[in-house]
Amino acid sequence: MTQAEKGDTENGKEKGGEKEKEQRGVKRPIVPALVPESLQEQIQSNFIIVIHPGSTTLRIGRATDTLPASIPHVIARRHKQQGQPLYKDSWLLREGLNKPESNEQRQNGLKMVDQAIWSKKMSNGTRRIPVSPEQARSYNKQMRPAILDHCSGNKWTNTSHHPEYLVGEEALYVNPLDCYNIHWPIRRGQLNIHPGPGGSLTAVLADIEVIWSHAIQKYLEIPLKDLKYYRCILLIPDIYNKQHVKELVNMILMKMGFSGIVVHQESVCATYGSGLSSTCIVDVGDQKTSVCCVEDGVSHRNTRLCLAYGGSDVSRCFYWLMQRAGFPYRECQLTNKMDCLLLQHLKETFCHLDQDISGLQDHEFQIRHPDSPALLYQFRLGDEKLQAPMALFYPATFGIVGQKMTTLQHRSQGDPEDPHDEHYLLATQSKQEQSAKATADRKSASKPIGFEGDLRGQSSDLPERLHSQEVDLGSAQGDGLMAGNDSEEALTALMSRKTAISLFEGKALGLDKAILHSIDCCSSDDTKKKMYSSILVVGGGLMFHKAQEFLQHRILNKMPPSFRRIIENVDVITRPKDMDPRLIAWKGGAVLACLDTTQELWIYQREWQRFGVRMLRERAAFVW
């Protein structure tokens, strides 16, 4: 065989291989990999770092670690000048709480909670007897703390060496009298951009870089100069801001110096971590709750929604309810970091969703603030322990007025660096529509007289009908440009979504209603049936006793009757494989690192430097 014939044979094999890949549905790379396939060795999992950034907690670790390091996602920065005003991002407090209508809304929400508690019978078939706060108040007002020890054992962070910044627990325990600003770089699942000090995009990214770098050095014991040998898997929210994701990827690759990155959505990673292929993911975090339906590794765009409340709101609501019952620790302040930690602890210790626990009960708790005596308080609580977590189902009880409480997946923001962003596609689509209309007009004008006579009643509106069909199709495609496989979704799902945008974005949906809405936006009854049969709850915001049974009862009672007849069981899973629900998404990121298919998803530093955000469109596991 001649050299030319050999070359033709090899070219034929390559073309045949490409054709076979296309038939299998493998994406043809728009941007060729700068690292040849022959040199792309299997990436060792212990050189992959999985990062799951939350609003309150950062979870970070090697893909081979059994558990990640979990640290408060906060930084304290020293004042650059003396006399600089003190600034600290709030934790339990938020905008919209002190409006004139807030208290009335709280009371109305609490009435709905009490009605729901009364309407559901206990396991013995009897109604639950309500306990008024007045029954506990007289006892609690008389209680005084007992001194356990003159030293609590906790100390403020030592700042005598004037560190420029402190991270995690050290930042939380900075003395308020020291000259440090406190920043939480992520709020309600998004970058904490605000008009105050440290609220610019550049400042927030700088805070995140410092926190993550500190965690990698301290907890993973990896020198920052060695990050060029490591790759990163970054978990992002299902409803994400493209600009923010782009900046985070740029920071990880170009500033921190990782050699490669894979970006994936929290919900899909939660399915990997739980071992479920198709499920409705309910992620109840500290500051936001997100719901979406995932099927075979794809997060259905139309089913995604984010609720702007979570565990912190339950803690604040619990404090309000305890105050009504005469909470004996009267110095408690929501602006104090130590008191916020205490309230979170009290919520996790006492709150539940068990209808069978009723009546007044005695409790005690300790206060161990730094450089203060250790105090023991005793007090009584009744229905407050059940009412607070039920606020997740009746969010009016949070008393938040004038804030956007529900977010659905919106059309994407344009990006000048991305030549194929949605704005470009919509503009070219509009030109195609105009061209099609002009062609249709010309064809109708050039028809023979006899033909026109046969269609006399229809010819005048034929181009308009043709154009309207194209426009409808175009709008359906335009709505599905940002996130994947949605061009195949039924028109009914699209209309359901458009109606939802107008109806729900101004309202605070309860958790059960949000789940029902998300499942209802699935494109087929078969998919809806799958989702009703498997609801996975992750995150730390719903870790209450009997939460599984409570949520299951709410979904069963409110789901459409047509599905209630055909679905044998609504399965609510709160601890898959007996795992901590707060770690499931991170664990899924670690599983993702070990999959063979992940090798095609890596974005390398040199590629990002050359092609930028276009690499996300090419390599992301979801449609960018």
From Swiss-Prot:
The keyword Cell cycle applies. Residues 1-25 have a biased composition (Basic and acidic residues). ATP binds at residues 55-56, 283-286. It comes from the Eukaryota. Residues 1-29, 430-462 are annotated as: Disordered. The modification Phosphoserine is found at residues 132, 412. The keyword 4Fe-4S does not apply. It is found in: Nucleus; Chromosome. The modification N-acetylmethionine is found at residue 1. Keywords: Acetylation, ATP-binding, Cell cycle, Cell division, Chromosome, DNA damage, DNA recombination, DNA repair, Mitosis, Nucleotide-binding, Nucleus, Phosphoprotein, Transcription, Transcription regulation. Its main location: nucleus. GO terms for molecular function: ATP binding. One of its GO terms (biological process) is regulation of embryonic development. GO terms for cellular component: centrosome; Ino80 complex; nucleoplasm; nucleus. Component of the chromatin remodeling INO80 complex; specifically part of a complex module associated with the DBINO domain of INO80. Interacts with ACTR5; the interaction is observed in asynchronous (interphase) cells but not in metaphase-arrested cells indicative for a possible dissociation of the INO80 complex in mitotic cells. Exists as monomers and dimers, but the dimer is most probably the biologically relevant form required for stable interactions with histones that exploits the twofold symmetry of the nucleosome core. Plays an important role in the functional organization of mitotic chromosomes. Exhibits low basal ATPase activity, and unable to polymerize. Proposed core component of the chromatin remodeling INO80 complex which is involved in transcriptional regulation, DNA replication and probably DNA repair. Required for the recruitment of INO80 (and probably the INO80 complex) to sites of DNA damage. Strongly prefer nucleosomes and H3-H4 tetramers over H2A-H2B dimers, suggesting it may act as a nucleosome recognition module within the complex. Belongs to the actin family. ARP8 subfamily. This is Actin-related protein 8. The lineage of its organism: Eukaryota, Metazoa, Chordata, Craniata, Vertebrata. The gene is ACTR8.
